[in-house]
């Protein structure tokens, strides 16, 4: 039944306490613990749990078995040590007529029995078996009911990026272009592949069509100046035969991700698509706005109404002369976003309509503060590492297939000082949650110059980060699977050598072993 508290591993980071103090606290905790109503399943009840609300097809089992080969696979993928700390918790969500709160407090412990100490070479057959954690969630919709036929997207990229195992965006595109079951959600995609061969175009077309993506793949030519190529995508979208049935033409980067299409469409429906509209967002970094101008930063997604797209298409030649391209160079090479803004400003009365839930994410370093901020982003960008940050929003967003769009990045605070940022992390605060949860933790930096306040206008002033303080440790989501019964299993991992979880910068590690936490989201 896993390790009990007697092994002293109950959520205990290695702290420089004296043994006496430790024992006193330990005995106190043990005493209080015996008085609490237990959320632990008695061994006799370690059986499939039947929820009377469910009919036969949706019975969820609390599976407390440990599968050695699955642990070995995780060990391989994430270079885990042989001895790990492990815990699994089922989370039963209850859809209610409530708003999505910045923080949902749950009056239960997340891991009342701490973690099991497991040797992957010889694991126990079962893990500590707990009753599901019960959490309320708003009634939000799932991808299988999206009708996005109002939208036609345009992206330029290269065949080599599409086929790169590390950064290929195709499965992410399928998230926002299909119903999650291999069928188009109605949205179209015009994909331009730079310098691709006929075979590459055909292969891409076939592969993406197979995945249910309504795509038209075209070649484009690297000899055309990049900024001009970018601008020419809008007339190409405007020219598409499906235009008549669209309301918005959307340009974005190959690393733009739209987690929640219902929410995106709801927001867009607040605007009158028959008027001239240029909708997008600024960079979070005022430094970039000063450098490049007040315009839509394309990685967050830029939405054009058809009437405005028509005007840009008409003026394409005038807007893309050598002189205009030179004017779009702010010292970082000619920028497509600038060429587009100038074309709109110089030929129409339209300026940017700011949709702040879109995110360019010009941030570097540890992005946790953003993803743990309780936000409900309509787009995400720059999350593939390299010079920007690294995150896994595709894996994170899988949970919406079970509990609806609002669940992604929704926060739950449990009685034992954990905060689940659903689909990003499970963070534990050993000294309590004594900070302003409404502010974003400044774990990241602006680039290339961080004045300390560049990001404040868009993200709000951020609170001081808790790195190297011993006050925070987080397991981050690495994978997630929608399972046959409709539940979603998430795997969160904390490595012992993570540079962030130490006492003092470069100081002693808070934990001696790697940690794996699993959450399984089941419906009520
Ligand atoms: C069982 O539940 C599923 C999903 O809620 C529903 O589609 C199905 O009709 C239900 N079957 C019965 C027998 O109630
Ligand atoms: C354990 O997991 C593997 C996949 O890693 C799977 O093939 C196997 O069926 C699982 N075994 C049991 C008993 O569930
Ligand atoms: C759009 O169609 C017009 C008319 O058929 C054509 O002249 C123009 O080159 C096309 N533009 C693009 C970018 O495909």
Task: Label each PLM-derived region with a short phrase.
Residues 2-97, 492, 497:
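N-terminal signal-anchor transmembrane helix specifying type II single-pass membrane topology
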Residues 2, 6-18, 416-524:
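Extended non-globular C-terminal regions
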Residues 190-248, 257-262:
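Active-site-proximal specificity loops/subdomain of glycosyltransferases
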Residues 63-182:
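Long, contiguous juxta-domain segments that are non-catalytic but functionally important
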Residues 15, 256-347, 355-364, 373-375, ...:
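Conserved catalytic core of nucleotide-sugar-dependent glycosyltransferases
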Residues 252-254:
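Active-site acidic Asp-centered loop
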Residues 131-141, 160-181, 200, 483-523:
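Short, well-formed alpha-helical segments that are part of the catalytic scaffolds
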Residues 350-402, 406:
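PAPS-dependent sulfotransferase catalytic core
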């Amino acid at each position: 039944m896993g390790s009990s508290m007697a092994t002293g591993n109950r959520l205990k980071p290695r702290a420089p306490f004296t043994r006496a103090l430790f024992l006193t606290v330990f005995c106190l905790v043990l005493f209080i613990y015996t008085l609490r109503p237990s959320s632990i399943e008695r061994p006799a009840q370690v059986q499939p749990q039947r929820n009377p609300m469910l009919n036969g097809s949706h019975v969820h089992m609390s599976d407390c078995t440990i599968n050695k080969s699955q642990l070995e696979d995780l060990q391989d993928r994430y270079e885990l040590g042989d001895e790990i700390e492990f815990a699994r918790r089922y989370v039963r969500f209850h859809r209610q007529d409530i708003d999505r709160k910045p923080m949902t407090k749950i009056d239960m412990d997340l891991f009342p029995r701490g973690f099991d100490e497991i040797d992957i070479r010889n694991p126990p057959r079962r893990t500590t078996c707990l009753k599901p954690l019960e959490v309320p969630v708003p009634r939000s919709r799932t991808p299988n009911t999206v009708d996005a036929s109002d939208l036609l997207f345009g992206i330029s990229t290269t065949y080599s990026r599409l086929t790169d195992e590390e950064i290929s965006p195709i499965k992410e595109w399928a998230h926002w272009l299909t119903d999650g079951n291999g069928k188009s959600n109605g949205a179209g995609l015009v994909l331009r592949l730079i310098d691709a061969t006929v075979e590459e175009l055909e292969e891409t077309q076939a592969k993406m069509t197979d995945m249910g993506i309504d795509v038209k793949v075209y070649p484009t030519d690297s000899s055309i100046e990049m900024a001009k190529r970018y601008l020419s995508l809008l007339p190409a979208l405007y020219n598409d035969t499906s235009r008549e049935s669209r309301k918005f033409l959307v340009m974005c980067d190959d690393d733009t991700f739209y987690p929640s299409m219902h929410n995106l469409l709801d927001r867009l429906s607040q605007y009158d698509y028959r008027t001239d509209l240029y909708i997008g967002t600024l960079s979070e970094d005022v430094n970039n706005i000063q450098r490049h101008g007040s315009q839509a930063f394309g990685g967050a997604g830029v939405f054009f109404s058809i009437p405005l797209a028509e005007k840009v298409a008409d003026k394409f030649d005038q807007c893309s002369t050598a002189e205009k391209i030179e004017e779009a160079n702010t010292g970082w090479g000619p920028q497509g976003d600038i060429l587009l803004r100038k074309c709109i400003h110089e030929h129409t009365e339209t300026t940017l309509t700011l949709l702040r839930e879109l995110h360019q994410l010009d941030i570097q370093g540890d992005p946790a503060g953003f993803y743990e901020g309780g936000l409900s982003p309509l787009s995400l960008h720059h999350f593939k590492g390299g010079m920007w940050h690294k995150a896994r929003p595709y894996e994170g967003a899988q949970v919406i297939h079970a509990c609806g769009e609002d669940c992604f990045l929704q926060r739950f605070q449990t009685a034992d000082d954990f905060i689940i940022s659903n689909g990003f992390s499970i963070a534990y605060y050993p000294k309590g949650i004594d900070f302003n949860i409404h502010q974003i933790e400044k774990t990241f930096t602006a680039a290339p110059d961080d004045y300390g306040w560049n990001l404040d206008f868009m993200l709000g002033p951020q609170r001081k980060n808790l790195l190297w303080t011993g006050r925070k440790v987080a397991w981050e989501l690495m994978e997630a699977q929608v399972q046959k019964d409709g539940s979603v299993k998430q795997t969160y991992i904390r490595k012992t050598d993570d540079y962030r979880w130490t006492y003092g910068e470069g100081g002693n590690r808070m934990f001696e072993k790697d940690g794996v936490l699993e959450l399984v989201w089941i419906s009520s």
